[in-house]
Amino acid sequence: MITCFIRYEIDPCRKDAFVEYARNWNQVIPRCGADLIGYYAPHEGSATTAYGVYNIGSLAEYETYRERLLADPLGLENYRFSQKEKFIRREDCIFLKPVSAPRGAPG
């Protein structure tokens, strides 16, 4: 399993648009084959940093997942929404693998 961390730099005056965008992914991401951990919008501290986090089995599964995202009507609509509204200033993606067990889990 690998975890994808998406870091967004968003327009702080358009946080509401980012929240709508994130809520749409709540439906699309699981439907397309990834395990959505969640989307996180600014609360305290930086008003411009947001995150999306999901798990996927492998990079090969990620490629299939991306194809499904591009074919999903709501996924495509959400992408167009972000392009039209321009509330995302920058988006970076990194894939990480777990190297320790969660606290309290046998390790």
What are these regions (language model features)?
Residues 14-15, 59:
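Residues at or immediately preceding the N-termini of alpha-helices
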Residues 20-37, 55-92:
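An amphipathic, aromatic/His-enriched active-site/gating alpha helix that lines ligand/cofactor pockets
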Residues 45-48:
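Short acidic/glycine-enriched loop/turn segments that link adjacent beta-strands
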